[in-house]
From Swiss-Prot:
InterPro entries: AAA+_ATPase (IPR003593), ABC_transporter-like_ATP-bd (IPR003439), ABC_transporter-like_CS (IPR017871), ABC_transptr_haem_export_CcmA (IPR005895), P-loop_NTPase (IPR027417). Belongs to the ABC transporter superfamily. CcmA exporter (TC 3.A.1.107) family. Keywords: ATP-binding, Cell inner membrane, Cell membrane, Cytochrome c-type biogenesis, Membrane, Nucleotide-binding, Translocase, Transport. This is Cytochrome c biogenesis ATP-binding export protein CcmA. Part of the ABC transporter complex CcmAB involved in the biogenesis of c-type cytochromes; once thought to export heme, this seems not to be the case, but its exact role is uncertain. Responsible for energy coupling to the transport system. Residues 17-209 form the ABC transporter domain. It is found in: Cell inner membrane. Its EC number is 7.6.2.5. ATP binds at residues 49-56. It comes from Gluconobacter oxydans (strain 621H) (Gluconobacter suboxydans). Its main location: membrane. The gene is ccmA.
Length: 211
């Protein structure tokens, strides 16, 4: 994990993230237009908006995987990212896939596996896991990181109702410890006191730029 001294001092206690007037283009297409938001300890923000509104792009920009064309993303601590890909090596067991994350992180592998009902699968090659089991394994990697800020892009893909409930319990526990998260999802999450941030469709702006 990054040393705390590598991050700026939060402007207020508990602040984990400031996104200030972020604009992103993809080629000639305007994807995000002046997005601003803040995230504090205990927050759970759900990104809403139509398909193509830039929800995944915003998460990638916050994570540092892409740079904004204008504006600024200010993080005050480490983050953990869950993208669309589960990123498991098929020939390695579940335990082997998560070993590096455990080594680099600060949380217990056994605790993460138990919380996500994966303990009985540790010696199974990843190629034999179901899509839901792979998704839970990817989420275990987020838990192992020890980061306070979680960016979760469609975390419930492939999960059944029971697994979504487990995920909700893990997310609630993370918030209770001072963590926070930004989530994109197409299904309701079992979380209380969430905030929503709507990203509008910019299709009309795209037509303007390309005309």
């Amino acid at each position: 994990m990054t040393s705390p001294s590598d991050f700026p001092t939060p402007p207020v206690p508990g602040r984990l993230l400031d996104v200030e007037d972020v604009t992103v283009f993809r080629g000639d297409r305007l994807v995000l237009d002046g997005v601003s938001l803040t995230l504090d300890a205990g927050d759970a923000m759900i990104l809403t908006g139509p398909n193509g509104a830039g929800k995944s792009t915003l998460l990638r920009t916050i994570s540092g995987l892409r740079r904004p064309d204008s504006g600024e993303v200010i993080r005050y601590g480490d983050l953990a990212w869950l993208g669309h890909q589960d990123a498991l090596k098929p020939g390695l067991t579940l335990a082997q896939n998560l070993a590096l994350a455990e080594k680099l992180g600060t949380n217990s592998l056994s605790d993460a596996l138990e919380a996500l009902d994966l303990t009985h699968l540790t010696d199974l090659p990843a190629r034999l896991l179901s899509s839901g089991q792979k998704r839970r394994a990817a989420f275990a990697r987020v838990m192992l990181s020890g980061a306070l800020l979680w960016l979760l892009d469609e975390p419930t893909v492939g999960l059944d109702v029971a697994s979504i409930e487990r995920l909700g319990a893990v997310m609630a526990a993370h918030r209770a410890k001072g963590g926070a998260m930004i989530v994109t999802t197409h299904v309701p999450l079992p979380l209380d006191n969430t905030r929503s941030h709507e990203l509008p469709s910019l299709a009309h702006v795209e037509s303007f730029w390309l005309s």
